[in-house]
Amino acid sequence: FNDRYIGKNVVVIGGGYTSMDCARTALRLGASSVKTYYRRENDDLIILPGELEELINENGKMIFKARPKNLIKKNNKLVGIQLIKTKLVKINNKYRLIDIKDSDFRIKADHIILAIGQKQHLNKNSKVNNKVFLAGDYATGATTLIDAISHAKNVSKKVDNFLMKRDLLHSHINDEDVI
């Protein structure tokens, strides 16, 4: 674990807990510049109070209303990223995020970290299909560590039941059993 590499010009994409952790960790690992880009506005961030201020105090930058468009490579090596500015518009009584025409811009980057929230659509057994299970934040979206651990424990029981060919209906997990 002593051989940690982080680029000098780091770009983080995202606006949540993980993006803040990634940006601040990159700074602590020696990155000269860390810029975090979020496609929405400050009020839409999903972070703890004070996290943005902590990022800025550590010399990180947060740029709002911009999203990635393309990676820029030279001789098969990452050298930058092309982004485009975004804006929120009301269309048919619904707000939608759209790209601003001709607002593309490029910045240097030798390390890009995608810290974007994604959530899967699952059936009631936390399965994507008959043989793939998901657990924790990937299955539920951003939650607390305790919730992620609880969900992972429940899903691990379901995986065990599936592999051992036990009936899921007769394998109840009590809340008291979940730490």
Give each language-model segment a name.
Residues 77, 103-105, 126, 161, ...:
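Short linear motifs in intrinsically disordered/low-complexity regions
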Residues 60-70, 159-171:
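Phosphate/diphosphate-binding loops
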Residues 1-6, 28-122:
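A Rossmann-like FAD-binding core segment of flavoenzymes
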Residues 172-179:
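Post-kinase regulatory C-tail/linker adjacent to protein kinase catalytic domains
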Residues 1-49, 111, 115-167:
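Rossmann-like dinucleotide/flavin-binding elements
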